[in-house]
Amino acid sequence: MPIIIDKDLPARKVLQEENIFVMTKERAETQDIRALKIAILNLMPTKQETEAQLLRLIGNTPLQLDVHLLHMESHLSRNVAQEHLTSFYKTFRDIENEKFDGLIITGAPVETLSFEEVDYWEELKRIMEYSKTNVTSTLHICWGAQAGLYHHYGVPKYPLKEKMFGVFEHEVREQHVKLLQGFDELFFAPHSRHTEVRENDIRGVKELTLLANSEEAGVHLVIGPEGRQVFALGHSEYSCDTLKQEYERDRQKGLNIDVPKNYFKHNNPNEKPLVRWRSHGNLLFSNWLNYYVYQETPYVL
């Protein structure tokens, strides 16, 4: 939340240079405050689990949020009861004439398909186009980030020889960008994907800025102009047991899956997971909400 100080206080310039949110008394006295409208486009089959993960993070701020859950009308969800979707979700057609302060587009287990092979690709493209003029800032996660980078900037994805699976160390590349306010220079984030986007392709698009990457896991955080689009290739929203559940699920299916790296204590799946990403996950979501949604959105959408 902002701190209110005199506009002539010498510390103001220093704080602003450090991306500390300061507000003059004049602005504070005239500021209107309302709940922020946040849409979550949930593409995951485990919808209720994903809901809890994201709501836990975006709810960890002093901001009041009015959350709208969305699902794809052009896709039949087989892993969630229709009653749940009917009761708690809307479709794009339901909200396309509204505006939102923020939009989160989740990952989806469709990355081995080309984008055009995904059955809801045309609908997703319409939503991503809509977000450019009707949403203050959109946060794309994992496959959602790959889809956004491809649709908006033509950045391709590439198959990996082995699944990127585990918790990896990342390095901050742009320390003074507000999204990374409070981040350590090195931080951890989970990844769980069969494809990647490449650093050279990101750096080849002048509108994009690479914020954080990993020697082993590659690109993690990317931002577009003015923070209108944020892309997170990892899963900072994951709960403690999510990678464990994915590992056990794939083993039960008889798939050749390695133990997630840097995740279990002593890398032993019989021991408990070590959570090393929670604090930076909270920072990522709170910084996005604070700096790119709350501070930038108009009072009247």
From Swiss-Prot:
GO molecular function, one term: homoserine O-succinyltransferase activity
Origin superkingdom: Bacteria
Sites where the protein binds substrate: 163, 192, 249
UniProt pathway annotation: Amino-acid biosynthesis; L-methionine biosynthesis via de novo pathway; O-acetyl-L-homoserine from L-homoserine: step 1/1
Reaction(s) catalysed (UniProt annotation): L-homoserine + acetyl-CoA = O-acetyl-L-homoserine + CoA
Known EC number: 2.3.1.31
Alphabetical list of Pfam families matching this protein: HTS (PF04204)
Site keyed Important for acyl-CoA specificity: positions: 111
Positions annotated as active site in the UniProt record: 142, 235, 237
Transferase is among the record's keywords: yes
Subcellular localization, as worded in the UniProt entry: Cytoplasm
InterPro entries with a match to the protein in the record: Class_I_gatase-like (IPR029062), HST_MetA (IPR005697), MetA_family (IPR033752)
Gene3D superfamilies reported in the protein's UniProt record: 3.40.50.880
Important for substrate specificity, annotated site positions: 192
GO BP field: L-methionine biosynthetic process from homoserine via O-succinyl-L-homoserine and cystathionine
Enzyme class: transferase
GO cellular component: cytoplasm
UniProt keyword terms in alphabetical order: Acyltransferase, Amino-acid biosynthesis, Cytoplasm, Methionine biosynthesis, Transferase
Functional description taken from the UniProt entry: Transfers an acetyl group from acetyl-CoA to L-homoserine, forming acetyl-L-homoserine.
Xref: NCBIfam families: metA (TIGR01001)
Family under the similarity heading: Belongs to the MetA family.
Protein name (Swiss-Prot/TrEMBL): Homoserine O-acetyltransferase
Native source organism of the sequence: Bacillus thuringiensis (strain Al Hakam)
Recorded name of the encoding gene: metAA
